[in-house]
Amino acid sequence: MKPGIHPDYHVTQVTCTCGNSFVTRSTAPNGVIRAEICSSCHPFYTGKQKILDTGGRVARFEKRFGKRK
């Protein structure tokens, strides 16, 4: 690595609005990052994810443009 061209890499405390916090490394200058969502409260990781109605979208597309054979 060339000296003097890379940003400083600090130990950083990340705090989520849900109250979860963890330590990582980052180039954040003050060593603190506030996040709105993390793996503890994100719906994908908590299992509370809602499945979108993609079947209805496909049916509507086929109705408008015809189903290919």
UniProtKB/Swiss-Prot annotation:
GO biological process, one term: translation
Keywords: Metal-binding, Ribonucleoprotein, Ribosomal protein, RNA-binding, rRNA-binding, Zinc
GO MF term (any one): rRNA binding
Binding locations of Zn(2+): 16, 18, 38, 41
UniProt keyword annotation of Cell cycle present: no
Cofactor comment text: Binds 1 zinc ion per subunit.
Essential cofactor(s): Zn(2+)
Coiled-coil ranges per UniProt: none
SS bonds (residue pairs): none
InterPro entries, per database record: Ribosomal_bL28/bL31-like_sf, Ribosomal_bL31, Ribosomal_bL31_A, Ribosomal_bL31_sf
GO cellular component: ribonucleoprotein complex; ribosome
UniProt-listed SUPFAM superfamilies: L28p-like
Assembly behavior: Part of the 50S ribosomal subunit.
Role played: Binds the 23S rRNA.
Family to which this protein belongs: Belongs to the bacterial ribosomal protein bL31 family. Type A subfamily.
Official protein name in the record: Large ribosomal subunit protein bL31
Species, as recorded: Thermobifida fusca (strain YX)
Lineage: Bacteria, Bacillati, Actinomycetota, Actinomycetes, Streptosporangiales
